């Protein structure tokens, strides 16, 4: 029986709530506003960048979770979509979502630890990590690996719950850590500094409630 809460890698029931909220915009937008004070449209806008990649491009989605970012991938787009996650259960959910969306032939599953990605340096044109960095045990090594596999001129994009978005959301952060849904997390300033140290200068960060959306280009 699935537990209601716990680490995302264990596929708790709460992970399904996250996926459902993204796939049902009308109620999802309301839920995101109430829980984390965030505009769900920012996620949809960020995911849409995947659909603008040309044929032959490679995108890494880590952690892919239930496959919510697949909504940006177009059938017949001709890209290689590497779906990486430390949980086989999450990979299975992503593959099921890919089949429903008619994009399964573009998706390559990879059972992997974000701190040691099995990809060559500079092999990805786009790296996305939506609602991922706040789940990792240590976000700093994850940032280093995401930047390592990104090619020069490639884009990194994602979202996370940040530690410095105000006291209003401290209850969300504390509860998330208590039930093992959230890891160490980091501040927006730390995220910018870490990516800059890894060759991604001028990371753009947009704050929406407890969430921070980020996008940068590797030098």
Feature-to-residue mapping (PLM):
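C-terminal alpha-helical "lid/dimerization" subdomain adjacent to the S-adenosyl-L-methionine
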Residues: 12, 28-32, 157-214
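A short glycine-rich, Lys/Arg-flanked "PGG" loop and its adjoining helix->strand segment in the class I
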Residues: 140-152
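A short SAM/SAH-binding and catalytic strip from SAM-dependent methyltransferases
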Residues: 126-138
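A short acidic, Gly/Pro-enriched loop at the edge of an enzyme's catalytic core
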Residues: 115-126
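Class I SAM-dependent methyltransferase SAM/SAH-binding core
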Residues: 58-116
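A generic alpha-to-beta junction signature in SAM-dependent methyltransferases
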Residues: 51-53, 136, 150
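Conserved class I S-adenosyl-L-methionine
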Residues: 1-53, 68, 72, 174
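Short glycine-centered segments of the SAM/dcSAM-binding site in methyltransferase folds
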Residues: 58, 153-155
């Amino acid at each position: 029986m699935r537990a209601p809460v716990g680490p995302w890698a264990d596929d708790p029931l709460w992970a399904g709530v996250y996926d459902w909220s993204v796939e049902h915009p009308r109620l999802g937008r309301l839920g995101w506003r109430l829980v984390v004070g965030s505009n769900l449209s920012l996620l949809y806008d960020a995911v849409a960048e995947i659909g603008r990649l040309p044929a032959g491009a490679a995108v890494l989605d880590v952690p892919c979770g239930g496959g919510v970012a697949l909504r940006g991938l177009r059938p017949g787009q001709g890209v290689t979509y590497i779906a990486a996650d430390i949980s086989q259960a999450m990979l299975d959910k992503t593959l099921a979502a890919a089949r429903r969306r008619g994009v399964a032939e573009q998706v390559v599953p990879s059972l992997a630890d974000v701190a040691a990605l099995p990809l060559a340096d500079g092999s990805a044109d786009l790296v996305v990590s939506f609602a991922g960095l706040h789940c990792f045990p240590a976000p700093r090594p994850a940032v280093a690996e995401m930047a390592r596999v990104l090619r020069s001129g490639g884009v990194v994009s994602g979202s996370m719950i940040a530690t410095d978005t105000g006291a209003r959301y401290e209850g969300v952060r504390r509860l998330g850590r208590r039930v093992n849904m959230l890891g160490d997390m980091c501040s927006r300033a730390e995220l910018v500094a870490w990516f800059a140290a890894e060759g991604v200068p001028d990371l753009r960060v947009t704050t929406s409630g407890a969430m921070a959306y980020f996008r940068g280009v590797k030098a």
